[in-house]
Structure formats: C-alpha cells, structure tokens
Amino acid sequence: MSTNITFHASALTRSERTELRNQRGLTIWLTGLSASGKSTLAVELEHQLVRDRRVHAYRLDGDNIRFGLNKDLGFSEADRNENIRRIAEVAKLFADSNSIAITSFISPYRKDRDTARQLHEVATPGEETGLPFVEVYVDVPVEVAEQRDPKGLYKKAREGVIKEFTGISAPYEAPANPEVHVKNYELPVQDAVKQIIDYLDTKGYLPAKKE
C-alpha cells in the first residue's frame, strides 16, 4: 500500500445518499466457467433493473474490461488475481455511489472472490456498515460449456493453443455458499434473471416495482 496518503471522507453519508437516490448500492458478482452464460445473464439483468425497476445499474464485463483498464494483464494466476482485485475495487466504487455493479468474470479462485467480498463488507472510514455483496454462481457442467464454446476457446485449450484455461488446464473453484445458485443449463435466461431479482427483492435491496 502507498504511504503518506490520507482517506478523505465524503460530506454525505451512505444513508443520506440512499435516501436522496431511493436506491441502495451493491455489487452482484457473477462467477462461473467460460461459456456458462455469465455475460448473457448480466446483459439481461442490467436491462431489467434499469428498464423495469428504474435503478442505476452498470455491467463490468470480463472481456470488455480487458480492452481498457486491464489490457496489460494476461491469464497467469498472478494476472488473474490482479484482474479480480482491480474489478473488485471498481465495483466497490460503483456500489459506494449507490449504483448496482454487475460483474461477470470467471473469477476462478475462491480466495479472490472472498477478498472481493471482504472489500465490500468491511466499512470504510466514516461509515458504520459495509456494502452488500451478492455472489451468483452461474453453474454449468464443463461438458455443457464445452459444447456451447461460442468463442472456440475450449477447442483451442484442448489443442494446447491456450494454456492455463479454466476448467481444462487450470482449476475453477466453485462457490461453497453463494447467495444465488443459478443452474444455467436448466433455466431459460428470463427465469435465471428472475431468480436473481427475486433474491434482491427478498433482501430489500431494490425499491418497490413501479406499476
């Protein structure tokens, strides 16, 4: 960590922001194998939250981020760790501004996801509580993901063209206790998104739906 720095707290508390914006900030963290459907769910989830529930939500997509913020990172374990660390920090900033951050990253290592959770749940200076962190396990068997393979990545991994590919030559550590477990090989997209939104409603994270 850098030295000789000071954290400057806002003049607004999080509760004041929540009251003024009529919205709680949180992060929805979608994790799962490549081709599990994370990005597809994230796109539809963002669409429904913004269009139907009238809340501020924004996607942070695993591929999109590597076009800019994380374009300097590869796919070694160290780079994957740094990839997730950066995204966790960015997602927290969105959540702290009372927006809903929707991240869709393979995030294969449990310790990295746990670190992202802790980053949110530990209160920052000037705040009494942390931020909600909703882990969504987008679950498909590797055989199903490999059959889908829209980018041809599994084929390249099997051929040895791609090294350290999650699910083939690198591990994926499934969440032990995710807030939402979506079996994305059984459900249509709309039903999977409904499962996530129903959880958010149950926890009181969303304002009441406007008729």
Curated annotation (Swiss-Prot):
- The positions flagged as active site in the entry are S107
EC number per UniProt: 2.7.1.25
Enumerate the InterPro entries for this protein: APS_kinase, P-loop_NTPase
UniProt-annotated binding residues for ATP: G32, L33, S34, A35, S36, G37, K38, S39
Annotated GO MF terms: adenylylsulfate kinase activity; ATP binding
Name a Pfam family for this protein: APS_kinase
Membrane-spanning residues = none
Q: Which UniProt keywords apply?
A: Amino-acid biosynthesis, ATP-binding, Cysteine biosynthesis, Kinase, Methionine biosynthesis, Nucleotide-binding, Phosphoprotein, Transferase
Which terms under GO biological process does the entry name? Answer: cysteine biosynthetic process; hydrogen sulfide biosynthetic process; methionine biosynthetic process; sulfate assimilation
Coiled coil: which residue ranges? none
Pathway linked to the protein: Sulfur metabolism; hydrogen sulfide biosynthesis; sulfite from sulfate: step 2/3
Q: Which reaction does it catalyse?
A: adenosine 5'-phosphosulfate + ATP = 3'-phosphoadenylyl sulfate + ADP + H(+)
Q: Mention any one GO cellular component term assigned to this protein in its UniProt record.
A: cytosol
Q: Which family does it belong to?
A: Belongs to the APS kinase family.
Q: How does it assemble?
A: Homodimer.
Q: What does this protein do?
A: Catalyzes the synthesis of activated sulfate.
Q: What is this protein called?
A: Adenylyl-sulfate kinase
What is the protein's species of origin? Answer: Penicillium chrysogenum (Penicillium notatum)
